[in-house]
Amino acid sequence: MCGIVGFVGARADMQEILQGMMDAIAHRGPDGQGQFIEGQAALGQRRLSIIDLEGGKQPMFNEDQNLAVIFNGEIYNFQELTAELMRAGHTFATRSDTEVLLHGYEQWGKEMLQKLRGMFTFAIWDRKNETLFCARDHFGIKPFYYYQNDAGELLFGSEIKSFLAHPGFKKELNEEQLPLYLSYQYSPGEDTFFKGVKKLMPAHWLEWKAGQLTVQRYWQPKFDPDDSRTLEEWEDEISAAMKESVQAHKIADVEVGSFLSSGVDSSYMAALAHVDKTFTVGFANKQYDETDYAQEFSKHIGVKNYAYRITPEEYWANLGKIQYHMDEPLADAASVALYFVNREASKQVKVCLSGEGADEFFGGYNIYKEPFTVTWYDKIPLPIRRAIGAVADLLPPVHGINFLVRRGKPLAERYIGNTNLMDEHRKKKLLKNYHPGKLPTDLSRPYFELSKGQDAVTQMETCDLNLWMVGDILLKADKMSMANSLELRVPFLDRKVFELASHIPTKCKVNANQTKIAMRGAAEKTIPAKTADKKKLGFPVPVRAWLRDEQYAGIVRKAFNTPAAEQFFRTKELNAMLDQHISGKRDNWRQIWCIFMFLVWYDEYFVKR
């Protein structure tokens, strides 16, 4: 695990520029650094040593020194691929997974990507042909950004902040991303909040040659339900697949720990992993605290649990630092709790296992129950439901109103992913300049087309796998772990596990009363039934309550009345939204937090820097 940076474009001070970019991501790799500069190419890497502690240094070269690679991540089938490549005549100088990329690219070219099992971004510079080849893993576990300026220079790296050290980077806000963010609570799609900066999307490669940039998808995850097996058979297959995946994800030359919340995902993983240490965070308020459960469960499986309770003061004091590490604004309040659990874990281990991906693969979100509730309402003709929904949208928010509004639209219109904080009408009221380049449905539509003809839950899962998981779940997992120089591994997000999960029918995933049906059944083979059936809190955070406390609401109010807030928002509307929440008239906490996090992020990148 590490961080990578680089650029293509000859300059007199390339070494100094590259070092500045590397320094910006030093937190990703405190164990060492490496550089390669030749002609117009500059590659840099910061290393967190996990496998082959002495021999895995980067940049790494092939036998004839023609290819140079920098790599962020882990290839879990590297031993199998090493053996295959050695049989084909390749000679290995190390026992690291990095070297597999060099020989694999020599042997198979771009087709190598179909063989890799792991989390990765990498860049290979072909010295002979002066070509740059980069790729991102199948699910987008590791981040990769790129930027091409008017002079044709290409900048790339694990974090956008590294670009600030390059004189060819022009820092400009992409204000068109703001309306999308206000719906999603994260920055969705390939565009970012920085003009010209793009994300290399999951399962895509990028190639640069003679100033020309080509970006292409190499793999597409797709659900293909199979009704031929029983629930018990699916449970057995999940159990076997997860045991194998967890063991593959434990390969390391350093100690591995595991995160532990009160939910089935992390409990199941901790029990399968047989690690010595688990890590949990919570709050003094018992409603938002999982530490007692974690310590009890850790005793049950015979491991030591390290629990930490976050105070409100330190939660709020670290918001700026956290938004800085995110690179783009993220309004997921759990990201702060994730920062602290990574911080505490990094004091004990270098690698932690975590449960990301289980909800998207196995049907874990409560909203997936929606198609099974009040099904009679869907039998009412759509034009009538639309009319009822339009009227309901004008009424005060009381129990049941949101249901009428949502069910007044077809699924592809109402479901843009796991979050939908604000509709276009509300955004128009709040924003001074409402000029969206894209609407949320423009981003979700391709995934409904991909899953066309499938049931509603499968369509929702497809949407979340490609939007919510990449834009929120995996963003915060990577940025919060790397901010603390900790490698986070996600055994659920494995190609072999997905190959299985993609065929599990919805009836074995979700019904009106339960989520992750088959996965919970598989977990019961390893952990107590009461744990397997437990509802996940998911790093719960008491932000709703804090925003009704003047001590913390006052911090938000101050931000809502800054010049930055005036620049983008109608501050009268912002203050009214906050007043409604404080008084209890409306529950606006998620919308308030979304705007507040944007302002905190903007302050970090466009006011302070």
Task: Report each predicted region and the residues it spans.
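Adenosyl-5′-phosphate
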Residues: 1-4, 165, 196-202, 212, ...
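Cysteine-centered catalytic environments shared across enzyme families
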Residues: 1-326, 338, 342, 524-525, ...
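Generic recognition of stable, solvent-exposed alpha-helical segments in well-folded globular domains
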Residues: 16, 173, 233, 237, ...
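Residues that scaffold the ATP/ADP-binding catalytic core of kinase and kinase-like folds
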Residues: 84, 166, 361-364, 500
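Acceptor-binding helix/loop patch of EC 2.4 sugar-transfer enzymes
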Residues: 160, 374-375, 520-521
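Short low-complexity, flexible loop/linker segments enriched in glycine and/or proline
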Residues: 320-324, 346, 368-370, 546-548
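Acceptor-substrate binding/catalytic loop of class I
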Residues: 330-332
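Active-site adenylate/phosphate-handling loop in enzymes that bind or generate adenylated species
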Residues: 340-398, 468, 474-497
